[in-house]
UniProtKB/Swiss-Prot annotation:
It comes from Paramecium tetraurelia. PANTHER family: SERINE/THREONINE-PROTEIN PHOSPHATASE PP2A-RELATED. It catalyses: O-phospho-L-seryl-[protein] + H2O = L-seryl-[protein] + phosphate; O-phospho-L-threonyl-[protein] + H2O = L-threonyl-[protein] + phosphate. Its cofactor is Mn(2+). This is Serine/threonine-protein phosphatase PP-X homolog 3.
Amino acid sequence: MSQSDLDRQIAQLRNCENITEGEVKALCTKAREILVEESNVQRVDAPVTICGDIHGQFFDLMELFKVGGDCPDTNYLFLGDFVDRGFNSVETFLLLLALKVRYPDRITLIRGNHESRQITQVYGFYDECLRKYGSLNVWRYCTDIFDYLSLAAVIEEKIFCVHGGLSPSIKTMDDIRAIDRKQEVPHDGAMCDLMWSDPDEIEGWNLSPRGAGYLFGGDVVDDFNRKNNIELICRAHQLVMEGYRVMFNEQLVTVWSAPNYCYRCGNVASILELDENLTKQYKIFEAAQENKGLPAKKPIPDYFL
């Protein structure tokens, strides 16, 4: 696949136009070659801009790039949940993947709980692939790539980034490095917890109302950060009406990057910019104008938000 082919595909995808099934297959083959070399805990250099859930809200991703700068000018780290719920999961994921193949050192993609065959069959990506391509091949190519995505990232050895949260099975980063990630997201265990867990104002660990992962308290965060010489955990996975939420004496932050989530929640979104000294700047943005006339998605039980 030549650079000019890739550049044409990126331009098409930026216009929210689909590339062919054959092009998707070739793109995924190339992406796999790049992702297989990345670590379970991928090292990322600052400056970098961290983005939370996107959920197929393509025009809001375009808004994000307006606010944060284009790739490769800006170095990006996306914390997963690229697909499901929004109307343009296909274009969203394929654009991010094409940028990854074109600029592998300027964009890092880690896996969220929605980067899963099972979840995408329920929440929209599967149906969207079938509707737009008339077969399940594109869904298969993409979900195969999900298995190669890193589970976490660490910025300058100081900021730990993950989609969901911590796990009682994980004490150190080496515990994450020991996971065989090339599989469907399991229903329980360390890999599952990284993608499903949530922080809460509790002590220790508690069962999660989501039915997967755990709730974990500030003492757990304190302990993990101390053991691993980490200053901050940065995660996504939970809708935050104000775009981001800092917890536990600034030891953890949730970043949410899907404005007016599901085209009905009325929330703003944010991205977190870190300069070379790891100084933080949150940038808030609202839903793109293109979404204004969209019909609201049917209500989702709050349990799953």
